Design a protein with these regions (language model features):
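Small-residue packing motifs within transmembrane alpha-helices
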Residues: 21, 25-26, 30-31, 53-62, ...
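Extracytoplasmic/lumenal domain signature
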Residues: 122-163, 177, 184-221, 226-339, ...
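Membrane-embedded alpha-helical segments of integral membrane proteins
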Residues: 5-39
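Cytosolic-side transmembrane helix boundary signature
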Residues: 33-58
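N-terminal, intrinsically disordered, polar/charged segments of Gram-positive cell-envelope systems
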Residues: 4-11, 76-147
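Hydrophobic single-pass membrane-insertion segments
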Residues: 40-45, 71-85
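Internal/C-terminal transmembrane anchor helices
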Residues: 51-75
């Protein structure tokens, strides 16, 4: 706008100078003519008196003065005209005619071009320990290793940067345990219930597998299925039955189970989408699909059967294992090598991140080569860097729960009650916190209204006899925001009590907003269970429900398009129960036997397996 006004003013000045220059030109011409005529007259008259000489000199001086003024004025006129041309060319209205410019300037103020509102950057964590979260408090001995050598320092070549949980996966569905890198929950889409009932839709029988100390049957803890709607391009090259490749909108259930198989079902009717993959190792954990939409599955075994526990990478094009790595690691302090946790993949860095029960945190460069047009995918993994640690707690190291990753920082807990924050760029330990007991339940992360990240953690009961704890931690400092202690947990050496279920964090904008829901097993008696809904800000109990049967299964939300919220929780008697946001029972469905596994919801259907060797698809109506 300033440019337009400046150009208009300059044009006005140059226009007003034209008459003045014309007058000066006429005066100058008259003076020149007078000088010529007067000089000629004096020359003819012979002698020139002193008085006439003075008049003639004055006439010449006046003429020269007017000539100089005329020259200066003309020069200024040229400068102003050049300025006007330049400003007009630079103005936003340069392509309009002069008349249009004058009309705009005299009728209404010019409109400034609209400006985009500044984009707020995504919130980030900036972890650093305080006096209360200093790893030295527990004498943590932290080692960064590469190729069997302890490093003084490490710097990753690739940048690891996990975005918001909503951006983790390119696929529609549930691609890892509790859905994403924040572990926000295992539900996809919305369901507007009418009758508010649960109805068996289909079932599929599975088997058992002999383990080190008995038989592993059906689906166990944590045992969540993965559910995905493949895009057409990927579906065309998958190892699916031809009729399933041709099916419009196919949604596939992928279930790694205790009987050593990975099963594949059509969510709609429970029919096989491809042959099961027999690996022969028991799978307690859910595993993960590649969030980039690549046809890869990452899954870890939980017990020694035919060989030591290990991590697997499975091609879903060829339906076979294309890479495996034993957890039997000479660098590990703990000699238990299972992989129950569900790993995460840093997409742009092409890096697999996987804490193991041996206490080793693995980061593996995959070197993935994927060619959709040719229907091929390969990996050539390199163990880039890993960490190991010791503490003075006297408890077990090793990670059984799944980790959280925010930005380039991983958060995870161990079987001894330690909880860590690690910078994945440098593998440095940023802070540590002690939670008093075994962390089996996967934690959950959320951004607070203050822009600070927070983590919710629950402990199962192994060391703190009779007690279990729930914490809210500050993700930057590692300090405890609030803590809840539950003192009526029955102790059982064979079957754990306390918090084994991963919590349900209420989604913003729904009836569950502001709540964190935890099932607590074996409380107040050895066979019963309690569900507590806590206020996320204060930790205070909002409501509490005591059930006859305990829960290892994790609650899963069912959200309506209008913000209405329910949740489903399965128990040790094989019952699936639908609750409303106030903790009131809406409907129940018996699935026959103990449900340790956690369900996953895809729109109006949930899938869960039982220890009774059956997988169910259940309609949410």
């Amino acid at each position: 706008m300033n440019i337009i006004l400046s150009a208009t003013i300059t044009n006005s000045i140059t226009e007003s100078m034209k008459p003045a220059l014309l007058v000066l030109g006429l005066i100058l011409a008259a003076l020149v003519i007078s000088c010529i005529v007067f000089t000629a007259i004096l020359a003819r008259s012979g002698g020139i008196s002193i008085g006439k000489k003075i008049v003639l000199a004055a006439l010449y001086v006046t003429t020269l003065t007017v000539l100089l003024c005329t020259f200066l004025c003309f020069r200024q006129y040229q400068i102003m005209e050049d300025m006007s041309a330049t400003e007009t060319a630079n103005s936003p209205s340069a392509t309009q005619t002069t008349a249009a410019q004058e009309t705009e300037a005299t009728t209404e103020p010019p409109t400034e071009p609209p400006t985009e509102p500044p984009t707020e950057p995504d919130p980030t964590v900036a972890p650093a320990h305080t006096e209360k979260s200093d790893p030295a408090n527990w004498k943590v001995k932290w080692s960064i290793m590469q190729n069997g050598t302890v490093l003084d320092s490490f710097q990753r070549n690739e940048t690891i940067d996990f975005g918001d949980a909503s951006q983790y996966s390119a696929l529609d569905g549930i691609v890892t345990f509790r859905g994403d890198n924040y572990r926000t929950g295992a539900s996809f889409g919305t369901t507007d219930m009418v009758s508010q009932t649960l109805t068996k839709k289909w079932s599929a029988k599975i088997g058992s597998l002999k383990g080190a100390n008995g038989n592993w049957t059906g689906c166990g803890w944590t045992g969540q299925p993965l559910i995905v709607r493949w895009d057409d391009e990927t579906k065309a090259i998958l190892g699916l039955y031809e009729e399933k490749k041709e099916k419009e909108g196919l949604v596939e259930v992928i279930y790694a189970t205790l009987d050593g198989h990975i099963y594949f079902y059509d969510l709609e009717d429970g029919s096989y989408t491809r042959d099961p993959i027999r690996i022969g190792m028991s799978f307690k954990g859910a595993g993960s699909l590649d969030p980039r939409g690549y046809p890869l599955m990452y899954v870890g075994s939980g017990d020694s059967t035919t060989k030591s526990p290990r991590m697997y990478i499975v091609s879903l094009i060829e339906n076979k294992v294309i890479y495996e790595q034993s957890g039997s690691d000479i660098d590990a302090y703990r000699k238990w090598y299972a992989f129950d946790s569900a790993p995460l993949v840093a997409a742009e860095a092409d890096t697999l991140i996987w804490p193991g029960e041996s206490g080793i945190l693995y980061t593996i460069k995959l070197n993935t080569a994927y060619n959709p047009s040719e229907g091929t995918i390969t990996v050539s993994p390199e163990n880039t860097a890993k960490t190991r640690y010791k503490t003075n707690t006297g408890h077990k190291t090793g990670c059984e729960a799944s980790s959280i990753i925010v930005g380039n920082h991983i958060y995870y807990g161990d079987n001894g009650g330690m909880f860590f924050c690690v910078d994945l760029q440098t593998m440095e330990l940023k802070w540590a916190q002690y939670t008093r007991d075994d962390i089996n339940a996967t934690p959950v992360f959320e951004w607070g209204e203050d822009g600070v990240g927070y983590i919710y953690i629950g402990t199962s009961m192994e060391y703190a006899k009779g007690n279990t704890y729930i914490y809210k931690l500050n993700a930057n400092t590692g300090e405890i925001v609030w803590e809840r202690k539950f003192t009526d947990v029955a102790y059982n050496e064979r079957v754990s009590g306390g918090v084994l279920s991963s919590p349900l964090l209420g989604k913003k904008g729904t009836e569950l907003e502001g709540l964190i829901i935890y099932p607590i097993a074996r409380t107040p008696s050895v066979s019963s269970g309690t569900i507590v809904a806590l206020n996320t800000e204060t930790g205070e109990t909002v409501w509490e429900v005591v059930n006859r049967n305990y829960h290892w299964s994790s609650p899963v939300a069912v959200y309506g398009s209008d913000g209405k919220a329910h949740f489903i929780l399965c128990d040790s008697a094989g019952k699936a129960t639908l609750y409303n946001a106030a903790g009131e029972v809406i409907n129940t469905l018996s699935l026959g036997s103990n449900i340790e596994a956690s369900p996953a919801v895809f729109e109006n259907t949930f899938v869960v397996g039982t220890r009774g060797q059956t997988i169910y698809g259940v309609s949410i109506e």
